Amino acid sequence: MNVVHERDADWFRSIYARHYQDVVRYGVRRLGGTAAAEELAQEVFLVAWRRRWEVPARTLPWLYGVGRRLLANHWRAERAAPPALELGDVPAADRHDGIARLVDVRTALARLSDDDQEILRLVGWEQLSMSEAALVLGCGTATAKVRLHLARRRLTALLREQPAAAPVRIGGTR
């Protein structure tokens, strides 16, 4: 089948059905609200449709990259930092055990640079492999590994500054 037929409305419906909720979750983790995240997802998929000939086979990391750039443009235009997640955004199951630890991690994470936060979120929250995270960030896999290593070190250092902080490992390596 030639590429022209692969990038039709059926192709788009397929990637939309497969990845819409992932893109919304990506937005919720960065924006703190479902409505804003759904709006971001709509913008991401609009770009995907318009640039459908450029979308690689590994679609999800590419979609996250589009979302990342859309958010960066928005924050730059608004001259505001990315919003911190409120405690109310923490899933109910997490509220019972380890809530203080979760707050410590979120507080420390918020003190990191946007780039450090992004690599930790991509690997830890989004569960992307290093090569997928590299695609989102627009860098090589080796560079992404170094960024993750340094971000983990900085996060660990911040957590050690807090009282009774235990070591935390964000995400695995794939």
Model-derived segments and spans:
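A short pre-motif secondary-structure segment
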Residues: I119-L120
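DNA-recognition helix of helix-turn-helix
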Residues: R68, S131, L137-E161
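Residue-level preference for hydrophobic side chains embedded in well-ordered alpha helices
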Residues: I15, H19, V23, V44, ...
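Arg/Lys-rich amphipathic alpha helix in sigma70-family domain 2
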Residues: R50, E54, R58, G65-L85, ...
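Internal acidic/polar
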Residues: H5, N73, A80-T107, S129, ...
